[in-house]
Amino acid sequence: MSVDVVAIIPARGGSTRIPRKNAKDFNGRPMISRPLEACKAIGTISHRVVSTDDEELARIARESGATTVIDRPAELATDTAGTAPVIKHAIEELGTDDDTLVMCLYPTATLTPHLVSEALELAREHPDKFVVSVGRHRSPHERSLERLEGDLMSLASTDHLLTRTQDLPQRYFDAGKLYVARASVWKARETMMDKPFVPFYLPDWAAVDIDEPDDWPIAEALHRVFVLESS
């Protein structure tokens, strides 16, 4: 396969905390449709792939612009299956060239085409490394609290008790939205972050987690303001 970019969306049918999350309505469209629609708007992404174990998701994916739907093996569709093995399985199924950029884009990645394009450009500048989407922690880790016995709490550490928060280092987290690297890099690695990687800094609205039911309306509101109403 000789294309500029292959976008692979891993979408399991099961979801423990938000049932049927990837098929759930998100501002009027199934969740999985959102990243597919963003990819369709980018000319260099000529192959939009969905790896799934679920017939309904496969149907929605095709209706939303997926060019290929891969039947994911049961052993790669468990709660404990990692992302890298799923993407490597898809790469093998597709016969993707080693030099092709492969982007893993999660169904909950409600990103604009502009953000996705920026991540791809960053990956082209760093052909031998992973590009990983990251968000910024809004509160310093040095001020984390921990529960004690009974009803009490304390600082997890008092090392920076008197340090001003603005003087503490900014920390980041893996946003779990997208990962990009050449196919050869995916094939050679067990995970995306076992070695130093190139961060792709997401704005706060794009890095919001969608793991609990209460996260859903917050993510929808942010998506309406920063994507739907600004386009």
What positions do the PLM features span?
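N-terminal nucleotide-binding beta1-loop-alpha1 segment
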Residues: 1-19
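Hydrophobic targeting segments
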Residues: 4-9, 32, 47-50
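Conserved SAM-binding loop
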Residues: 24-25, 50, 103, 208
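A short, N-terminal amphipathic alpha-helix
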Residues: 31-47, 59-64
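Short active-site oxyanion
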Residues: 44-49, 130, 205-206
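Short phosphate-binding loop-to-helix
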Residues: 49, 56-102, 110-111, 118
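Conserved core of the sugar-phosphate nucleotidyltransferase
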Residues: 85, 109-196
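Conserved alpha/beta core of the MobA/IspD/sugar-nucleotide pyrophosphorylase nucleotidyltransferase superfamily
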Residues: 171-231
